[in-house]
Amino acid sequence: EALDFDRWWPDRSRPLTPKGIKRIHREAEGLKRLSLAFDLILSSPLERARQTAKIVAQVLQLEDRMVEIEQLAPDQSVRDLLSGLAAYAAKKQILLVGHEPLLSGAVSFLLSGKTGAQIQLKKGGLCCLELDGIPAHKSAMLQWALAPKQLRLLAR
């Protein structure tokens, strides 16, 4: 949850609300319970995404594995994002922290070859894709998806 767009300009510097920070922390605690091992956390350079990535990295004790990439900014295309991810192809498990509709578009493209395949991630949601090599259309298999509420329930 970010502060109101109308009251915060420029959008790149718009932070999470105190409620949003609390929710992300609980979701990160739920993520920790899954015992996933991330090689890298890639984040959008926008403030609210950076805050989210930092909270997750702290909870998972992965602060040294955070990298910001412009290709996760909301004004980028799915093609830009996938090109940016190619630089990290040697990494096995990467957590992406970005924005909608870019992330849903990328997931849709990787699963179906189309960016509008009705895949929708909620703010703070998470999905796991298994990729076969460098990201290309129809190269992924969805392993699981969790809504933010499910992650928060795992934290209990």
Predicted regions and their residues:
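Active-site catalytic microenvironments for nucleophilic, acid-base chemistry
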Residues: G30, I55, V59, A87, ...
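Short, cationic low-complexity segments
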Residues: K149-R156
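Generic beta-sheet signal
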Residues: A90-G98
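Domain-level recognition of soluble alpha/beta enzyme cores
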Residues: L111-M141, A145-P148
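Active-site-proximal alpha-helix that buttresses catalytic centers in soluble enzyme cores
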Residues: E1-L72, Q76-R79, S83, A117, ...
